[in-house]
Swiss-Prot record:
It catalyses: N-methylanthraniloyl-CoA + 3 malonyl-CoA + 3 H(+) = 1,3-dihydroxy-N-methylacridone + 3 CO2 + 4 CoA + H2O. The active site is at C164. CDD domains: CHS_like (cd00831). Keywords: Acyltransferase, Flavonoid biosynthesis, Transferase. It is an enzyme of class 2 (transferase). It comes from Ruta graveolens (Common rue). One of its GO terms (molecular function) is acridone synthase activity. Belongs to the thiolase-like superfamily. Chalcone/stilbene synthases family. It holds the Pfam family Chal_sti_synt_C. Its EC number is 2.3.1.159. This is Probable acridone synthase 3. InterPro entries: Chalcone/stilbene_synt_C, Chalcone/stilbene_synt_N, Chalcone/stilbene_synthase_AS, Polyketide_synthase_type-III, Thiolase-like.
Length: 391
């Protein structure tokens, strides 16, 4: 029995998991938000719906978004008119592009992350791939392993259909893997596309317009490992704790269903209020062990689900205006990229901290929180420890 305990101890890391590198990628097609209402109603042959177009334009104007990236080209939409209908039978066309573009975009982000990490890709021991697009067998994890040329013995985990909160989920899982498999290095990839969800407008589904105004395509990749070798690796953030919570009275607030018409997304109006009204519970539980209760004393990596969510969180917690700056910047430049979005915010935080001459990767602060919000309603809470920025 003693030898079993010794074996178990030998498998565990000495310290917490750390994020060692970050890479991001977006499709080449760029859509300016100011022009998008005209483009969207033209491509979906819905210009006669003038009242609905006015509502959509208002949504776009209030979205905080300046531009978005999407894999769909004008040529693809013209060649696949069923995709442009509100409920056209278009799953095959959507799948044809998603099963190719999901791993391709993920690979682009992964190459950047591995390059920053600076170690051979043969040292990657585990792969976590997350997406709500292109469900297939074998999955995008298999495709990425082949495209990237990872070791065929890499231990893979494919996560489909979790939605926007999964940027926190993958970090929670990567933390567990890294800390319970000594010497492991986990490649985490989130690659999200609007291919399943793009559809034309309908007067009977105004909530669908919200997603059309916010969602975008993007991929983010991280390398996660515990006990980094300081001679060849450098931690960016330490993953101190991770938890998940279902919010009360939130059944059906955000739902997605795969149909012949693609992935239909349904949003209730009270989603921002449900998130902001319950956010203090996971926050208090996560930071109580550290004796932290001043939410302006930590740095914030919040999934920018939409402008109302960010605004109501600020108001609920009394956050200073600049606390959600990184989230708002990513929302402005990229839109809501589902699970990959919060990892873009993480990258923005470390880049901005360096550019502004801050003392740590957390805007000069030591402790921070990463929040993922999504269907359930589900909240993922990750406590982060920043690292000093070398002069």
């Amino acid at each position: 029995m003693e030898s079993l305990k010794e074996m178990r101890k030998a498998q565990m890391s000495e310290g917490p998991a750390a994020i060692l590198a970050i890479g991001t990628a977006n499709p080449d097609n760029v859509y300016m938000q100011a022009d998008y209402p005209d483009y969207y109603f033209k491509m979906t042959k819905s210009e006669h719906m003038t009242e609905l177009k006015d509502k959509f334009r208002t949504l776009c104007e209030k979205s905080m978004i300046r531009k978005r990236h999407m894999c769909f080209s004008e040529e693809f939409l013209k060649a696949n008119p069923e995709v442009c209908k509100h409920m056209g039978k278009s799953l095959n066309a959507r799948q044809d592009i998603a099963v190719v573009e999901t791993p391709r975009l993920g690979n682009e982000a992964a190459v950047k992350a591995i390059k920053e990490w600076g170690q051979p890709k043969s040292s990657i021991t585990h792969l976590i791939f997350c997406s709500s697009a292109g469900v297939d067998m074998p999955g995008a994890d298999y495709q990425l392993t082949r495209i990237l040329g990872l070791n065929p013995s890499v231990k893979r985990m494919m996560i489909y259909q979790q939605g926007c909160y999964a940027g926190g989920t993958v970090l929670r899982l990567a933390k567990d893997l890294a800390e319970n498999n000594k010497g492991s290095r986990v490649l985490v990839v989130c690659s999200e596309l609007t291919a399943p969800t793009f559809r034309g407008p309908s007067p009977d589904a105004v909530d669908s317009l919200v997603g059309q105004a916010l969602f975008a395509d993007g991929a983010a990749a991280l390398v996660v490992g515990a006990d980094p070798d300081s001679s060849i690796e450098r931690a960016l953030y330490y993953l101190v704790s991770a938890s998940q919570m279902l919010l009360p009275d939130s059944d059906g607030a955000i739902e997605g269903h795969i149909r012949e018409e693609g992935l239909t997304v349904h949003l209730k109006k009270d989603v921002p209020a449900l998130f902001s009204g319950n956010i203090d519970t996971p926050l208090v539980e996560a930071f109580k062990p550290l004796g932290i209760s001043d939410w302006n004393s930590i740095f914030w990596i919040a999934h920018p689900g939409g402008p109302a969510i960010l605004d109501q969180i600020e108001e609920k917690l009394g956050l200073k205006e600049d606390k959600l700056r990184a989230s708002k910047h990513v929302m402005s430049e990229y839109g809501n990229m589902s699970s990959s979005c919060v990892l873009f915010v993480l990258d923005e935080m470390r880049s901005r901290s360096l550019q502004d001459g801050k003392s740590t990767t957390g805007e000069g602060l030591d402790w921070g929180v990463l929040f993922g919000f999504g269907p359930g309603l589900t909240v993922e809470t990750i406590v982060l420890r920043s690292v000093p920025i070398e002069a």
